[in-house]
Amino acid sequence: MYRTRSSDEVTTSTDLTSSSDVATSVDPTTSVISSTSADPTTSADSTTSTVQTTSAGPSNNIGNSTLANSTTFAVSSTSIDPTSSSDVITSTVQTTSIEPTTSLVSSNDITTSTSLNISVVISTSTDSTSLIESTTTVGPHASSSVAGMYRTRSSDEVTTSTDPTSSSDVATSADPTSSSAVTTLVDPTTSVVISTSVDQTSSSDVATSVDPTTSVISSTSADPTTSADSTTSTVQTTSVDPTSSVVSSAPVDPASSVVSLTSSYPTSSSTVTISANSNGSATLAAQTTSIDPVSSIVSSSGATTIISSASIDPASSVVSSTSSEPTSFIVSSTSVYSTRPSGPTTSTDLATFSDTIILRVSTTSTSQDTQTVSSSLTDMVSSTGSADLSVSSIQRSQVDPSTFAVSNSPVYPTASTGSTSTGIPIASESLSLSRQQGISATSSSSIVTLTPVDSASSSRSSATSIIKPNMPVSSNDSKTQSSVSVVDAFQSTKSSYPSITSADPTTLASENGLVGSSSSAHPITLDRTYASAHASVTDIVSRVTDSTRHTTLVTSNINIQSEVGNPNYSGPKDTTITKQSAFMTSPASTSTISNVQSTASVMNHSIEDNISAAASLESVSGTSTKDYSSQSSAIHYTNSFTTTTTNAFITSKHSIAAVSTGAITSSASISLIMEGSANIEAVGKLVWLAAALPLAFI
């Protein structure tokens, strides 16, 4: 489980007869008394300690009772508020001075608090009278609420000496079992903390300078004998409007079928993350997302680099690094498909609109604040596009590990046989599964008990709006946990329960149509011909435990087939698309498009998802099989899509690993958080949710 240090490792005396360890050491020169008690029955450190420094007079040697010779004493404490949901660390330093001539007592309290969710240097204060300096820092284990086990070291593990001439504190803590020493120097004039960790077994030095005025980087020493501790530093170079970075609205003119898009938010965002691995290397991940405000096409690019060494300039917060592996990786792809290999040109009359172009856009974004990865998939239908469109492009991203500059270039472009114009988002769905692991602290009688906390959650949202003559259907829902939904055309994105709408094929229905994933509605006149549809979903989840470390994290395969027949259409009836994408330490990606024939007259949908995940201490696999079937009273031309996507991530211990898999309307995000060396089997229930549409497009 987690390594626990008891008080007797760092103090001079231990009471072995009592049920709890009580360690007390007295320095006869300075009469400094340190006392800390720990509960030996729990695997927790005593994170609250009180150090009282008293100058005793030589005439009576009675410490506190003789106030005339006791000029100063200081009491410092550090505690975790168990009632606060934000895991606030509070450090209080009280310095009391007594004037021996006038017996005037003056007290000075310095209280600083910080949230465990951020990595900053909290406070560095120096009392010029007593020359007692208190420095409270939060280590990188508290850099994220989902980072797992938080390590809090009590002050009795550190021996502090004060140099009256330089007013600087030199603190050294030593772990006798790991032979590691940590030296922290505090410059009281500049309040700059310089921490040096020396692993005497491997002779490797790690130095991190922190500028408390900018509060950008924080660091802590790692235990070199175990793999449970590591150092993590996070740098975010670009800020973006956190409200939204997507197109806010996409109104449609029903007469001309022209889409006008407006955006009130930035159309590009960039995120860079650096994670230090336990083997001494670092992982750099860069993510850039941009949105075309005209076509609403979302492109995402990024790269992951293994850095052998990295240093941070405390003045400019610039990371300098050297890498033994390439910094160029294929990380994202955007494919544009046509529902028909050939056909007549597009008509602007929506009622006779005979050609529809589907733009499949897959995006993946990383939230720097919550350390979770989410993915989304958007299907676009062109309102004024031409036929014979078949385009697949893959982005290669170059990342400069020193400046975090990201440059993108296409790798495998396929020439387009047609052109696209303004697109209308018709389908968007996202699924996320996250887990949080941490500790909660309760304090009683100077004993802090740490309790592991484990929680998992899943959520899913989707919005679909298909605009096609004689084939109007929309499915929109937003739920949490498992669900199956087939909803009425053009419901809001917050629909919670499924419903089926049947209409007379000869009747024209005027609906308030939802275009895209926004919650606003736009009137669109549609001709309904489908009378009935039904869907069934079967979910199977299994878990496998594995002890493999540093291996491929997740592999996902998604196959989608969709067919609907049209006896009046004589051209090629199927388009098969096979795609593979690999996210590894070397570029790997293939894209193949071919045409096949089909004569199916009944629409069938089948989705098979296979997910397997392997983290540093476990692997999880889940299988979800979904079968959709529907029959229609009006059959149109045939379309068939088969999309296979394989994503593989290489991860290291203590890093947050995620995978996003997407098919035409299926998108998933899985976040696995590992910390410590605990053999944790439960990663959280993998929940798949799907919306079934009784038409050719999902």
UniProtKB/Swiss-Prot annotation:
Any GO CC annotation of this UniProt entry: membrane
Region annotation Disordered: where it falls in the sequence: 1-65, 133-183, 197-274, 455-480
Taxonomy, superkingdom: Eukaryota
Biased composition (Low complexity): 9-56, 158-183, 455-465
Induction note: Induced by pheromone. Down-regulated by RIM101 and inositol.
Name of the protein: Pheromone-regulated protein PRM7
Organism: Saccharomyces cerevisiae (strain ATCC 204508 / S288c)
Gene it is expressed from: PRM7
